Amino acid sequence: MDGNDIRSTGKCPVMHGGNTAMGSSVTAWWPNALNLDILHQHDSKTNPLGQDFNYSEELKKLDVEALKADLRALMTDSQDWWPADWGSYVGMFARTAWHMAGSYRTSDGRGGANTGNQRFAPLNSWPDNVNTDKGRRLLWPIKKKYGNKISWADLIVLAGTVAYEAAGLKTYGFAFGREDIWHPEKDTYWGEEKEWLAPSDSRYGDVTKAETLANPLAAVQMGLIYVNPEGVNGKSDPQATAYQMRETFARMGMNDEETVALTAGGHTVGKCHGNGNVTDLSPDPEAAGPEFQGLGWMNTKGRGIGRNTMVSGLEGAWTTHPTQWDNGFFEMLFKHEWTLTHSPAGASQWEPITIAEEDKPADVEDPSIRHMPMMTDADMALKVDPIYREISLRFMNDFEAFSDAFARAWFKLTHRDMGPKARYLGPDVPAEDLVWQDPIPAGRSDYDVAAVKARIAASGLSASDLVATAWDSARTYRGSDHRGGANGARIRLAPQKDWEGNEPQRLARVLSVLEPIAAETGASLADVIVLGGNLGVEQAAKAAGFDIEVPFAPGRGDSTAEQTDAASFDVLEPLADGFRNWQKQDYVVSPEEMLLDRAQLMGLTAPEMTTLIGGLRVIGTNHGGTKHGVFTQRKGALTNDFFVTLTDMANNWVPVGNNLYEIRDRKTGATRYTATRVDLVFGSNSILRAYAEVYAQDDNAGKFVRDFVAAWTKVMNADRFDLAA
């Protein structure tokens, strides 16, 4: 039975109504079916604000200083239902923001703070996110007051930033612009485990080798934000924990210095809570009964608040003054020798062997009582690991450097998934350009577009070359963290120019023709590449009998090598591109699943994905010039032949090798075409076949061209945030 099964004597055994639970869904019957739902998320049907809602316009109405004043007041406005430690919510709001932003991973750009996803499952119920629900509920009166002018995503991150300011930190800045989602994300893979905090072994090739952590994951266990605070698989070993920290934080986009700064700065304020018994807590928010109203982990047997709060199970503060921004963390760590012990809840943690009474942090409710401070295994890693130790000692001896490093790392942590500065809004955006923001110089729009287009048309480059190059330049865009895309023309720079998926020799040949055109006309190369692709599409449409102009908006810029962190772009390299019928090697994941993942990252719907596949095949853009899926005798013409052939029952589909099929005439057995799984899924999957049949219809050849142009333009402009503004 499904998770909504309710058994009670005297109740009618007949089910009424719709399929409201997960257990009896279509995918439960056919778990291996292609899940197109990831392409149909976050549409207007789930958004209560409506299609016309414009967050950037609402933000213009926000009184930012009044909002920050209200947040500062909240920091010390302790509520009886969830009292503040030491009368301050600084630690609470810093942790809530940290844990929302800290789920980001660079591998696919998913996770992070950009969508307010902590409000929904699974993140709202992760073991590592215990009591972040209380943080969000404490913010509700402010969200209620400012309404649509501030998103939950922006509010949570701003609250964390204001918390640090209230503690005394000079922060680096803040940008608004995060838009809320309205249901759980269906596309993010958090791991294969079926239980919270399952041992790390299933996600590592070798748990003793941190680099063997499975992609795209960054956290070491299901339900954790980063590493296990008690040690690898809960077994204390600070050096082993350091190895996992280094890999995990690197996958979050952080270097060693940023890792030390974030760990120490995160633990300069607040405390761990483990003065209780986990068995006394109610279920997590998703599993709790309706009487809990979306709150989880409530103590149903004891007091459960203040000094009796349960969160991680570890217990204690890291510093003498946990509501102040100071250098107390490093001083506490290096001033004392530490021994392994256990919290009242039984969690492994470290405490000083000896410590002066005045160095102990006060009780959260009674300042006359003092308690032992504590360190996690991750904290001890900063002392034990040679690289982390050197950085930590430098920070301990230079508080200003530590404060600046943390402020910058905090800004990076909370803004990493927002994309370039063009998406930043509000009065506190820092003026400095940072390389991790993938800066792009302003482009020109005052050149003669028609003249540039004429130069490209006379260049001798084929429509296939033009379309493939523009596609390769634009397809790197990821809607998850808004990185990549055609703007910046980074396809000409390392590492993109050497990616196998970009066909380096063909790319170099095409760029050698387009670069002089850009230089001589005043257009950016980024614009010329896209304009060339548009021209190729127009030529292909004309060859099919349709005159159509592909929309073009000039103004892209060309980034330099100095503005490009080459190593950070490695994660954008495509391992496969079903749109060009290519994959680098065989993978456990099927080719059609990899196509779906790329389409989702690019922000495409299933119909858009379908029309792009059909058009790119017949134009002839396959990687390496392969003929797989080119179901036409009019290659180079933007016809609907791909769909016509795919749905023609005169054909038979025969597997002839790994991911390879032949399309044979049913009567003669003659081979007409070859195909891959990516091609055939548009006839085998019932939903995709329904789309294919629409485009195969005799009366929809023109619709196909128009829809292809619309989807193409969407891809080319995906990173043009200046247009959206």
Curated annotation (Swiss-Prot):
Lineage: Bacteria, Pseudomonadati, Pseudomonadota, Alphaproteobacteria, Rhodobacterales
GO biological process assignments: cellular response to hydrogen peroxide; hydrogen peroxide catabolic process
Keywords: Heme, Hydrogen peroxide, Iron, Metal-binding, Oxidoreductase, Peroxidase
NCBIfam families per record: cat_per_HPI, PRK15061.1
Cofactor(s) annotated in UniProt: heme b
EC number: 1.11.1.21
Domain of life: Bacteria
Family membership noted in the UniProt record: Belongs to the peroxidase family. Peroxidase/catalase subfamily.
Subunit structure as annotated in this protein's UniProt entry: Homodimer or homotetramer.
Name recorded for this polypeptide: Catalase-peroxidase
Crosslink feature (Tryptophyl-tyrosyl-methioninium (Trp-Tyr) (with M-252)) location: 98-226
Covalent cross-link (Tryptophyl-tyrosyl-methioninium (Tyr-Met) (with W-98)), residues: 226-252
Active site: 99 (proton acceptor)
Enzyme class of the recorded protein, top EC level: oxidoreductase
Catalytic activity, as annotated: H2O2 + AH2 = A + 2 H2O; 2 H2O2 = O2 + 2 H2O
Keyword Heme assigned: yes
Modification note: Formation of the three residue Trp-Tyr-Met cross-link is important for the catalase, but not the peroxidase activity of the enzyme.
Function: Bifunctional enzyme with both catalase and broad-spectrum peroxidase activity.
Record site: Transition state stabilizer: 95
InterPro entries: Catalase_peroxidase, Haem_peroxidase, Haem_peroxidase_sf
The organism of origin for this protein: Paracoccus denitrificans (strain Pd 1222)
